[in-house]
């Protein structure tokens, strides 16, 4: 077997200002290395703007068929203090230009998505100024993507280990594991679309206390499904707003409830890094503070509950009610719960069979998502 060697990617670092860009452009145009010149001028390019803010970094990742024109467009927005481009006036700002002779539109979008996903998981990066990602249907071998990406990352790491830590360190991080930016399996994607459809329907009919139950064993990808669907609602809202579309059936009035302090930290970091906190304030809560803060008279639109088997069914600590799920349902139009039946063990979370059965009997079984390992036996059911 002949093993095809994937060519080395081009990774060029340029100071992020118009003069440095002009010099770089001149170098490219005058270069005797035809392949280098051709790759940067005639193939799509992935690029990263990064700058320091206090002790941390912020980044913007993009891809373009014309890197020089695209960068000038970004620079034209620098005077506006409300735009991320305003930060590029900082002398610490850098631009990385990334090219490869095999880049096509679909691959550069995948590389861009993976860079956004990785950089969002890096501890020293406090903000990734990108909108939603759009996973591609692949028109090339996935192994080639992994190979080219690893080479790009290695070169970026050579330049700055704080911004570009080891790939393995990223994949082990709690933020990466809970990130809404994972590429979903077909089953997860179906489940996500179905949940969103039900949310839109409930908002359209101005319903209250709608319950969507997502069941599955531990390790079936419910966490990623949960965070991805939660984030998607914000993305849809932003897109409709930016396109001046009717916002009646879109919502940014969404909350994520989690039970552990570590999870609160992780999801708050995700909300900060993706700019949700800046735009919408606190979107992540523990159940009791959420119940105490929001009133029955003014319900929020959507609440997602991760690990709903941990909700209390009796008063304990600062919780004075009898059933947290009941109390959440009274305060929201739609509640999406991720439920792990095998894990209902301790007494204060003791979901008596009757309570559980009562919920389920009010619910028509809607759909089983996939029989395979990823989301084996996730049932989506609604009241």
Language-model-derived ranges and their functions:
Residues 185, 192, 196-205, 215-220, ...:
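Conserved helicase motor core of SF1/SF2 NTP-dependent helicases
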Residues 109-112, 121-216:
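ATP-dependent helicase/translocase motor core
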Residues 46, 209-213, 253-255, 302:
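Residue-level preference for the first positions of well-ordered beta-strands
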């Amino acid at each position: 077997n002949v093993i095809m060697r994937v060519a080395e990617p081009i990774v060029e670092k340029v100071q992020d200002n118009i003069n440095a860009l002009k010099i770089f452009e001149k170098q490219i145009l005058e270069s005797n290395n035809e392949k280098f010149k051709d790759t940067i001028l005639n193939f799509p390019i992935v690029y990263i703007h990064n700058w320091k803010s206090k002790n941390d970094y912020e980044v913007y990742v993009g891809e373009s068929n014309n890197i020089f024109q695209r960068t000038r467009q970004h620079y034209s927005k620098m005077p506006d203090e409300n735009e991320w481009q305003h930060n590029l006036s900082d002398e610490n700002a850098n631009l990385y230009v990334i090219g490869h002779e095999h880049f096509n539109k679909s691959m550069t979008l995948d590389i861009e998505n993976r860079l956004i996903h990785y950089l969002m998981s890096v501890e020293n990066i406090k903000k990734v100024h990108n909108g939603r990602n759009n996973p591609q249907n692949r028109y090339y071998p996935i192994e080639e993507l992994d190979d080219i990406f690893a080479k790009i990352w290695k070169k970026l790491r050579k330049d700055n280990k704080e911004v570009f830590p080891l790939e393995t360190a990223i994949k082990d991080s709690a933020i990466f594991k809970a990130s809404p930016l994972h590429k979903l399996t077909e089953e997860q994607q179906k489940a996500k679309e179905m949940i969103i459809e039900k949310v839109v329907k409930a908002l359209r009919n101005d319903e209250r206390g709608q319950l969507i139950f997502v069941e599955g064993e531990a390790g079936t990808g419910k966490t990623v499904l949960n965070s991805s669907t939660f984030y998607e609602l914000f993305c849809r809202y932003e897109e409709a707003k930016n396109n001046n579309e009717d916002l009646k059936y879109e919502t940014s009035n969404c909350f994520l409830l989690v039970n552990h302090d570590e999870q609160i930290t992780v999801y708050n970091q995700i909300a900060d890094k993706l700019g949700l906190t800046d735009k919408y304030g606190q979107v992540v809560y523990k159940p009791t503070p959420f119940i105490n803060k929001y009133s029955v008279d003014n319900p929020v639109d959507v609440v997602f509950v991760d690990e709903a088997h941990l909700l209390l069914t009796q008063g304990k600590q600062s919780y004075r009610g009898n059933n947290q799920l009941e109390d959440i349902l009274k305060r929201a139009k739609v509640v999406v719960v991720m439920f792990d039946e095998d894990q209902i063990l301790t007494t204060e979370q003791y979901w008596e069979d009757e309570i559980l059965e009562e919920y389920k009997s009010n619910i028509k079984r809607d759909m089983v998502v996939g029989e395979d390992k990823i989301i084996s036996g996730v049932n989506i059911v609604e009241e």
